[in-house]
A protein has these predicted regions:
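Active-site environment of divalent metal-dependent phosphoester hydrolases
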Residues: 14-26, 55-60, 79-83, 126-131, ...
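Active-site neighborhood of phospho(di)ester-bond hydrolases with catalytic His/Asp-centered motifs
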Residues: 2-12, 42-52, 121-124, 150-161, ...
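Hydrophobic structural segments
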Residues: 40-49, 69, 110-114, 119-121, ...
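Active-site-proximal segments of metal-dependent phosphoesterases and phosphodiesterases across multiple
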Residues: 1, 116-149
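Conserved beta-sheet core of the metallophosphoesterase superfamily
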Residues: 4-6, 136-183
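Extracytoplasmic/secreted proteins, especially bacterial periplasmic and envelope-associated proteins
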Residues: 20-31, 102-105, 109, 137-144, ...
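Binuclear metal-dependent hydrolase catalytic cores centered on His/Asp/Glu-rich metal-binding motifs
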Residues: 63-122, 140
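Acidic/His-rich segments in extracytoplasmic proteins that coordinate ligands and/or metal ions
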Residues: 1-45
Length: 183
């Protein structure tokens, strides 16, 4: 009822309570999701991303259809507070060259497998807190994410507002052109 329709469950506090906390979060969110997804609910469907049911699951996208739009959503964290076994239950991508290359591959494959009108990535960044300027390295990383097929990068972690910008990237993948703007 507060107006939250899409949740990012991937951040550095997600596994603070280990697997018990992750299981409790998934149970609570799915309970609300089930209530919201009934035909007589006055609220839009509830979607989420960022947690795995088992350690064997991979990062995957959440597919959302809303008012005629096909939307992909994925929430990933680059930082963890707890490095126990529960870390394998989060959508985690190490902020290393290898980790980021692996994430780019996942995102490209998702965009190809599920053609969409909009692809949103919720990314909990490994970056210094309380810094208002956007680093050139961050801009370069975001450009690569755009080239991989992401349309909106919903980045979070610095604890302060940072500037935002739009960029134009070239993609080899086809982009849907039959988009209707909903009122």
């Amino acid at each position: 009822e507060a107006g939250f329709d899409i949740l990012s469950l991937a951040n550095n506090h997600t596994n603070d309570q280990q697997t018990t906390g992750i299981d409790g979060t998934l149970q609570a969110v799915r309970t609300v999701q089930k209530e919201r997804n009934t035909l007589d609910s006055p609220h839009p469907p509830l979607a989420f991303s960022g947690l795995k049911d088992t350690v064997d699951d991979s990062i995957s996208v959440t597919r959302i259809t809303y008012r005629g739009w096909n939307i992909l959503y994925c929430a990933v964290t680059e930082i963890l507070n707890s490095h126990d076994a529960s870390k394998k239950r989060l959508y985690y991508s190490a902020p290393t060259k290898r980790g980021r290359e692996a994430l780019l591959t996942i995102l490209k494959n998702a965009r190809t497998a599920y053609p969409c009108d909009l692809f949103i990535l919720g990314l909990h960044l490994d970056e210094p807190e309380y810094v208002r300027t956007v680093s050139e390295a961050k801009k370069a990383w975001f450009k690569r994410l755009g080239e991989a097929g992401v349309d909106i990068i919903w980045a979070h972690h610095p604890h302060v507002m940072q500037t935002w910008e739009t960029i134009t990237v070239e993609r080899t993948q086809p982009v849907s052109t039959d988009i209707a703007i909903a009122p």
